Structures are given as structure tokens and as C-alpha cells.
Amino acid sequence: MELQLAIDLLNKEEATILANKVKDYINIVEIGTPIVINEGLPAVQHLNDNIDGVKVLADLKIMDAADYEVSQAVKFGADIVTILGVAEDASIKAAVDEAHKHGKQLLVDMIAVQDLEKRAKDLDDLGADYIAVHTGYDLQAEGQSPLESLRKVKSVISNSKVAVAGGIKPDTIKDIVAENPDLIIVGGGIANADDPVEAAKQCRAAIEGK
């Protein structure tokens, strides 16, 4: 089981400092969509150039022109790129093919997908490396959790790995770990903690059953 740190509300220099502080406890560092919007793909390059031992994910949330956008993210050092599950099948397939051509991976974000089981099966067939159930920020504010969505997706796929994101914190991660996803994505639960290193350490300990 992998652990990903999602960083959204810092600049690229701050994100790189935070990532290096916690890199011993995580597998993947995400340059979140707000950073990409504010600073562009050079933020991905900056992190990639200044960290070792972890993969770098560019959270582009691609919707169209998928092969081009994946190729650009890869050019700037991304190991994993995200596309939206509500994108057209042709876009998903183009993104998968482009990522795999470069030996990289594609994560499909299921935010706003209505029929989770059907779409997850489609994405599994299209070759997605990860399918991520994602309770977005706006729904977290309404008290929603990704647990039920995680169970639904896990029940129907056979090839893709399952990722889960949305409001996960050190004190709630054990409920997620119990569902045995392949990748757990934690954002503010680490990044906004009083002691991010301790928070990351606690998340890793929960994953390892300690």
C-alpha cells in the first residue's frame, strides 16, 4: 500500500521543502492542481529536480487534448499524470497510451462520476494504472467520505490499482487502510498539520499496521 502527499496551497519552493521533510514516509508527492494553475508545469520540474526516492505526480485533471497534455507533464518530470474519469473514452485511451509510451503512469480521478461501478469497469478495460475515488473539497464540507465509493470501485475492477482521496487524516486513515486500497492520498492531513513529519509518520505507521 502506497502513501501519496498531495500539496495544493503552497508555492513550488515551499512544496519542495515540505516534500523533502516527509519523503521517508511517502511514496508519491503530488503537485496539486492549484499549484499547476498558479505556477505551471515548471513547478513539477522544480520538485522533480530537488527530491529523490519518490515519484512525482502532476494533478492536471485532464479533460481533452489528453496525449499532448500528458506528454507535456512527462517532459517536465511527472511520473504519474491525472485525467478526469468523466473525460471521453478516446481521451482516456490517448492518455494511457502516451503515459505508457514514456514508461509513466496514468491516474484517473473519479470526482463527479455518477455511476462509479460502470465507469470503473470501463477505465479498467482502457488500461488506467490507478482509479482514484475522490471526495472533493466541496463535498467534504458537507461531511461526505470516500469509503463507500472505495468499496464500490474495488468490487468491480481487476487490473487497475485503486486510490482513495478526500479529507483523510492521521486519525481517520485506519478506516481507509482497513479497506485495503493500493494508494492512499493525504493532503491537508499532512500538509496543514502542526507537525507534518509526525503526521506523515503516523499515516505510514497505520498503513504498516503499527
Curated annotation (Swiss-Prot):
One of its GO terms (molecular function) is 3-dehydro-L-gulonate-6-phosphate decarboxylase activity. Keywords: Carbohydrate metabolism, Lyase, One-carbon metabolism. Its EC number is 4.1.2.43. SMART domains: OMPdecase. GO terms for biological process: 'de novo' pyrimidine nucleobase biosynthetic process; formaldehyde assimilation via ribulose monophosphate cycle; L-ascorbic acid catabolic process; one-carbon metabolic process. InterPro entries: 3-hexulose-6-phosphate_synth (IPR017553), Aldolase_TIM (IPR013785), HPS/KGPDC (IPR041710), OMPdeCOase_dom (IPR001754), RibuloseP-bd_barrel (IPR011060). It is an enzyme of class 4 (lyase). Pathway: One-carbon metabolism; formaldehyde assimilation via RuMP pathway; D-fructose 6-phosphate from D-ribulose 5-phosphate and formaldehyde: step 1/2. It catalyses: D-ribulose 5-phosphate + formaldehyde = D-arabino-hex-3-ulose 6-phosphate. It comes from the Bacteria. Signal peptide: none annotated. Belongs to the HPS/KGPDC family. HPS subfamily. Catalyzes the condensation of ribulose 5-phosphate with formaldehyde to form 3-hexulose 6-phosphate. This is 3-hexulose-6-phosphate synthase 1.
